Amino acid sequence: MFRKAYLTAEKSFGTLYPVFIYILFLISMKKKKLVVLTGAGISAESGLKTFRDSDGLWEGYNIEDVATPRAWKKDPELVLQFYNLRRKNVLDAKPNAAHTGLAAREKDFDVHSITQNIDDLHERAGSTKVLHLHGQILKMRSEKNDRLVYDIIHDIHLGDKAEDGAQLRPHIVWFEEPVPMIEEAMAVAGEAECFVVVGTSLVVYPAAGLLHYAPHGIPRFIIDKKIPYTSAVQDITVIEKPATEGVGLLAELLKDLKFSI
């Protein structure tokens, strides 16, 4: 088939047929789009606690007391204290083998990471296309204007103001707030040629719904140390391992995919 196309091109394009062949070569070398959705489980192995402990608390706090707009209105000092501590924890943490393993896949794939995590471990591991669904702990913003966003590595205090005069708050999407990046994430998922879920059990929405936006019939994988059965994990390759171990296994499974997708 390729020889027939080659001869047809040679006849049709004449001296331009080498250009045609070069275009075919570029198409064959185009990296396949690998979309990865990551959750708290991938950063847990770097020492960052998951969103809920077994007792239903988050770093010893009730979610409602530190991660909702109502909490911010009721006790902003407590909220700032909570996120200041989390920021320190993130700065002390280091990317683990799962983070670096996903970054290494960029050698063979066009990797897009969509993360529910607010840390920067994907970026520090070398990932170049990272979309943060729930905000970033190393950024802060005006409480009145979500377009006024600033980098930060220190604490935020009551009285710290944005340029519009409003109090600065963590650049985090709290519970009961809309998820601004969800539409962009849906678009990315819709272009996937392979979809991988790491460190999340697919029970927290709207992020869990992203898998449904991936094209039907593409290779799909889920990596987590404990995967509950839900309709979301049907027709998907399950790797029930911790993220660091599972991403290593994934690398082997993806070796042939870069040519066969």
What are these regions (language model features)?
Residues F2, F20-I261:
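Conserved catalytic core of sirtuin-type NAD+-dependent deacylases
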Residues E10-K11, L26:
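Intrinsically disordered, low-complexity segments
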Residues K4, K11-S12:
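Polybasic, lysine-rich low-complexity intrinsically disordered segments
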Residues G14-L16:
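Compositionally biased, low-complexity intrinsically disordered regions
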